[in-house]
């Protein structure tokens, strides 16, 4: 039996087990509490949602966990509690929760209107103005992610580090396990199921997906040549070119062509490697530098040139075209909104890349900054929260047509 069939069999068996506990013994006349709205997973591959009459089951394919979500006004909620290596139960809608903000995109909560139920975060460098506002106002507390006793006070703790030992109230949300931008964005439905706001999650994802696909179709229809793109990073004397499917999908959908290097890493202390790296960069029109920077504000074009260690740059058309970029335009200290807002709104990333590849000059970038032009990151602060924190944040729709 292959893994897909096995997963379906396990899910059906689990649903049958829960149905037995929920409906197997009835004392007199009972009222049925039904699940109100539904989410269907369309694109993501690492989670699935199954619905019963008074419960839901979310299966996480990354860590093998099944989350049994029990409606708070159902009989089963008061008499059932699971905390095993494979099954955990939660009473929903969650009354409060915390999040490991080093690995969990809080932007999903903003789109769902759940910020005021967020009561704890593990870092105060989160790239959300409204989360920072609530934290500054004392409505959210900062937590030690290793203090399980402190984390246990919440109905759930959302985190994305699969290497961390989970406690009974931990729910693993791992959009970063997905290979495409839309697959990652669809994890809003995972969060929505814990709060009974599937209809809102569906609405947000549909809006984002339609805008993304429209932009991708426009980019595909361009008749001009596809720019060659080097998506690269530097670490300890070695440059490498990305092979990550997530980035490749963005480049493809924006109308670019990723650099096809013979090998993946180039050591600048090796003359042969340096010469080959030099030659390769002479063939590209766009460079996206994703080198990790603990101080993004001071990462400039000079930093890139110094790391490159190439004296003759006369053939670099990406410099002639002023097309040297980083995706750290929006930051909070050393944290990048690329790992928060960009996850829930990939249409904005795609629109940025289309402008990078086919510049018009009349578009304002959201996530990318131009190193050649000396653009610096924008530091996100609580004063930038200009809306009611209890309201839902609508996705930004990029004009497409």
Predicted regions and their residues:
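N-terminal ligand-binding lobe of clamshell/alpha-beta domains
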Residues: 2-401
């Amino acid at each position: 039996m292959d893994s897909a069939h096995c997963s379906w069999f396990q899910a059906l068996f689990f649903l049958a087990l829960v149905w037995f506990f929920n409906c197997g013994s009835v004392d007199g006349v009972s009222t049925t509490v039904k699940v109100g709205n539904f989410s269907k997973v369309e694109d993501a591959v690492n989670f699935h949602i199954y619905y019963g009459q008074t419960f839901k089951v979310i299966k996480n394919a990354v860590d093998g966990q099944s989350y049994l979500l029990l409606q708070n006004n159902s009989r089963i909620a008061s008499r059932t509690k699971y905390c095993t290596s494979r099954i955990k139960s939660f009473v929903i809608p969650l009354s409060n929760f915390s999040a490991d903000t080093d690995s969990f995109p809080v932007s999903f909560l903003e789109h769902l209107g759940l910020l005021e139920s967020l009561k704890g975060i593990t870092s105060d460098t989160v790239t959300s103005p409204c989360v920072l506002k609530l934290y500054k106002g004392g409505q959210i507390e900062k937590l030690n992610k290793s203090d399980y006793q402190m984390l246990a006070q919440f109905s759930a703790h959302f985190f994305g580090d699969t290497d961390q030992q989970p406690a009974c109230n931990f729910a693993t949300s791992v959009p970063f396990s997905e290979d495409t931008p839309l697959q990652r964005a669809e994890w809003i439905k995972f969060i929505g199921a814990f709060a009974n706001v599937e209809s809102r999650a569906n609405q947000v994802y549909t809006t984002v997906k339609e805008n993304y696909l429209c932009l991708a179709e426009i980019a595909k229809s361009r008749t001009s040549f596809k720019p060659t793109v080097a998506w690269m990073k530097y670490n300890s004397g070695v440059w490498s070119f990305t092979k990550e499917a997530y980035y490749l999908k963005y480049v493809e959908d924006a109308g670019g062509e990723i650099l096809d290097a013979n090998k993946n890493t180039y050591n600048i202390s090796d003359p042969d490697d340096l010469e080959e790296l030099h030659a390769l960069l002479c063939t590209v029109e766009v460079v996206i530098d994703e080198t990790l920077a603990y101080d993004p504000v001071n990462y400039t074009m000079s930093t890139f040139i110094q790391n490159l260690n190439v004296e003759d740059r006369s053939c670099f058309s990406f410099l002639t075209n002023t097309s040297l970029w980083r995706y750290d335009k929006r930051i909070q200290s050393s944290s990048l909104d690329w790992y928060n807002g960009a996850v829930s709104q990939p249409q904005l990333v795609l629109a940025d890349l289309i402008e990078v590849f086919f510049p018009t000059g009349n578009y304002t970038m959201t996530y990318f900054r131009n190193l050649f032009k000396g653009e610096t990151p924008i530091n996100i602060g609580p004063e930038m929260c200009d809306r009611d924190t209890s309201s839902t944040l609508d996705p930004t729709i990029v004009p497409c047509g």
